[in-house]
């Protein structure tokens, strides 16, 4: 069970650009996740956005009207019981930002695939995001047919049939399809009921050695701060197993790149947890579920501008090795998704450059050897990962990285 104030489950908000992921997140949480200046200017998500909400239920009203995220019942104004606190991970839908979406997928216990009723289905990144969820093992999926306020009933039914056809044979074949207008808040009660039913809180073993996927890192100090007021660097991410508490020593891998002569190696960073927080509230300890901010004693220069994102953190001496080369068992898709021409995917080749996502890290590697059942890849940036972890594999096709499958680390 998550600590009070902590979310129990992470739900990804995925889908094609401009289909309404960020608007739906805002309607459910009250938080507009596009806060980066470039995002506001361009009107699209660029980084992963995070926001929490509590699903509540009125004990006197019938289903689904009894479900809300408000402070009182939308139907009768009565008192509410809190059922569960959840975290949304809002992933970018633009094709150039696929690496960011893939790094977010590793944090997701379930996902909401947002599809606009006002456009033909599937759009390129609708396909690519669904394949990514499949490749990275995210199975609990809901489909939101958004923007139903913009189409006629006939067009909405036709779009629904397109969605059913598109998801046939995929991990989302039996996913509920919920028509919603995020703009008007229509049918959100039905969506909340479906989240409760179809995206359960995973069973967590808090006795395992803790591991935290680092998705963001920051310098929280304002320019011109007095030296006595300076705070250590902050990392943000999700605990995937075990528990961390204030005062614990924390090791972060791969760490810092050190060059001696003409040789380069990576040195893990060891620090101390000064604070744990979620949504502006302090915690004494944190367990899996939701997105956690970890205050440390690190020089903020090491954490600024997401410098440590993609790292793995845990207790000193418990983390897996840092890999500079990786041996994987590849599982490739049949065709390239996300592009207009759905080309047949050829097997991996020796000396091919690939983009790999494992956990929250994104790296590029060159295949040293490639067979159908085994590939060895030399990494440009090392990763800290365990045997058995899933790796998303992307190949450069034209000017874009395209998801071509996944691999299991051997």
Curated annotation (Swiss-Prot):
Free-text function comment from the UniProt entry: eIF-2 functions in the early steps of protein synthesis by forming a ternary complex with GTP and initiator tRNA.
Class of the enzyme per the UniProt entry, highest EC level: hydrolase
Disulphide-bridged cysteine pairs: none
Family: Belongs to the TRAFAC class translation factor GTPase superfamily. Classic translation factor GTPase family. EIF2G subfamily.
Gene: eif2g
Binding site for GTP: 18-23, 146-149, 181-183
Sequence segments annotated as region (G1): 15-22
A Pfam cross-reference name: GTP_EFTU
Residue ranges of every copy of the tr-type G domain listed in the record: 6-203
Keywords, ordered alphabetically: GTP-binding, Hydrolase, Initiation factor, Magnesium, Metal-binding, Nucleotide-binding, Protein biosynthesis, Zinc
Binding site for Mg(2+) 2: 18, 43
Name this polypeptide is given: Translation initiation factor 2 subunit gamma
Record-level GO BP terms: formation of translation preinitiation complex
Region named G4: 146-149
InterPro entries, per the entry: eIF2G (IPR050543), eIF2g_C (IPR015256), eIF2g_dom_2 (IPR044127), eIF2g_GTP-bd (IPR044128), P-loop_NTPase (IPR027417), Small_GTP-bd (IPR005225), T_Tr_GTP-bd_dom (IPR000795), TIF2_gsu (IPR022424)
Positions of region (G3): 90-93
Gene3D superfamilies attached to this UniProt entry: P-loop containing nucleotide triphosphate hydrolases, Translation factors
Residues annotated to bind Mg(2+) 1: 22, 45
A GO term for molecular function: tRNA binding
Catalytic activity of the protein: GTP + H2O = GDP + phosphate + H(+)
Region of interest called G2, as start-end residue ranges on this chain: 43-47
Cofactor(s) listed in the protein's UniProt record: Mg(2+)
GO CC, alphabetical: cytosol
Subunit structure: Heterotrimer composed of an alpha, a beta and a gamma chain.
Keyword Protease tagged: no
